[in-house]
C-alpha cells in the first residue's frame, strides 16, 4: 500500500499538484489524525498523517488524483466537560473541502453522542470530501467595482429567483446557470440593479428537526462546508464550481457585481444533541465558544457559536473569504449575525478577524456588509462596525414602516433615517453608503405582505406560529390577507409606492428584496426559512408589470440625483438637501417634532419629493420655480407645470424643475 510522505503544512485542505495530493488539517488537541480515502468500490483505506507542524497535521499522497473521495478520523480525548469530543468512529469532513459527495440525512450514526460517545462506525453513510482540480478560463473578467454611491443591491435566493421563470430553459431553472442566463441578466439591467446579493451558496444541511417534519432548510443559513458550493443549485454537482463561475463571469460582463451572504457565526452541528459532521470532532475546543461546563455559548440561536477570535479559526475564516474572492471572483460579502465576528467574547472593533480582513490586500478591497447583531447580551452593534463595513440599517426599516403604515413617527425622526441615519453612521470616517437601507429582506414580511397582514401566519413552519418576529410594523389596511375591494387594493398599492420611493430615493445604499417589485407574497409567513415551495419561489407569471416599471423608474431616477450618488454627508447650505413644510418654508422645531406628516425634500436643488402622510387630501405649495412631475409619477410627454400639488392622503410625488 502507498505510504504517505510528510508533505507540507500549508495551504489548508486537499491540494493536487499534478503528481499527488497534499492534505492538511488543523487540530490543536488531537493525538492522532487518520486520512481515510475511498476507492471506486467504497473500500476505505486509512493513513496516519505523518507530518505535525505546530497544530497542523499534514501528509502527501503520491499518485492521488482529482476525484479522490476522502475524510478524516481524528483521535483524542472524550472529555465533554473540558470541551473535547473526539470520536474516531466518525468520518469527518475536511473544513476546507471544495466539494462534498453524499447527503446530510438525519441518521443516528451521524451523531457522536451527548454525554457518552457513540462508537458505531458511520463511514458507510457519511458524506465524503472530493479532491478537485482548479482550471478555469476567466477570459478577460474584471470586477465591476461599482462605487458605493452608485450601488443598488438586489437580495435573492438562487433557486427561488428563477425556478418558475417561464423564459429560462426548464433544465436550468433554479440553478447557478440560470443566474447567468441572458433573460435574467437583461431583467436585472433593465431594473437598474448593480449588485446581486445571493442567500448562502456554501454547502449547507437541513436540521434533523426539519427533516423529521418533512421540511428542509431553504434559505441555507446552516453551513457544513464553507469552501464548497451547495450542489443542489447545480445542473451537475461535479461541475457546480464552473457553473457558478460562468454565472459570475456573465454578470460581470453586464456590469453587475455578485455579493455572497456568508455564515461564519455557527455551523450545522447545532447544539450537543446535533450531528457530528466536522468541526466538533476535529477540535471542538478550538472551533467553538465553550462554556465552563463544556456546553456551547449559543449567541446565534442555532446551538453553537464559532470562536472567531481563536487564531486558527481566524485563519480558517480568512482563507474561506479569500477563496471566494480569488477562485470565484465574488465582489463582496454580507455577513450573517456579524456581531459574532467581533466577539472576544465582548464585541470589539479591533477583534482578530476584523483586523485580519483590514490587513488583507484581497479582502480589504471588496464590499463588506454586516448584519450588525447577534442574540447575546451586547449583541446589538448597529453603527459600531469598523470603517470598512457597511451595515444593515434596521433603524431605516422600522422608521419607513412606522411613518407610512403606523403613522406614529415624527418628521424629524423620518428625516434622520432618510439622511442615511447620520446619527448612527457618521463616525470614524464612514460615508453615507455605510447605511444599507432596507424596507424588507428575506427575513420578515415581503413588501406586499407588509400592507396585507397585521399578524404573521407561520403555521406551515410546524412551530404553531411561535417562530418569526411579532414586531412587523405592518398594516393590512382593514382586512387581513390578500385581495379585497378596489379601494383596498389601491390604498395598499399607494403604501407600497410610498415605501419603495422612500427606500430608493433616500441617502444610503438601498437593498431591494427580490420579488418586492413584482408584488410577491408569502401569504403572511415572515420566517419562510423552511419553505422550499411556491410560497417562496417567485411566480413570474403573476408579477405586476406596473409595479416592476414603477420600481425601475425610481432606480433610474435615483441615478440622476447627485445628492444621492455622490456619497457625501449632507451639510447645511451645501445645496444637497433642503427640508421644507407644506408652504415651502423651512420647518420649525415644533413642526419637526409635532407637526403634521407633511414634508418637502428638495434634493440637488432640482428634484423635489413632496410627501403628504396624513389622512386628508392636502394642498402642498411647491418652492419657487417651474416644477413638473416626473416618472414614475407622471408620463414623459407634455409635462404639466405645477405650483401647487393636491397631495392625496398617504401620498407622495416627485417633481423636477
Curated annotation (Swiss-Prot):
Residues 458-467 have a biased composition (Basic and acidic residues). It catalyses: Hydrolysis of (1->6)-alpha-D-glucosidic linkages to branches with degrees of polymerization of three or four glucose residues in limit dextrin. Pathway: Glycan degradation; glycogen degradation. InterPro entries: GlgX_C, GlgX_Isoamylase_N_E_set, Glyco_hydro_13_cat_dom, Glyco_hydro_13_N, Glyco_hydro_b, Glycogen_debranch_bac, Glycogen_debranch_GlgX, Glycoside_hydrolase_SF. SMART domains: Aamy (SM00642). The active site is at residues 336, 371. Its EC number is 3.2.1.196. GO terms for molecular function: glycogen debranching enzyme activity; hydrolase activity, hydrolyzing O-glycosyl compounds. Belongs to the glycosyl hydrolase 13 family. Removes maltotriose and maltotetraose chains that are attached by 1,6-alpha-linkage to the limit dextrin main chain, generating a debranched limit dextrin. This is Glycogen debranching enzyme. It comes from Escherichia coli (strain 55989 / EAEC).
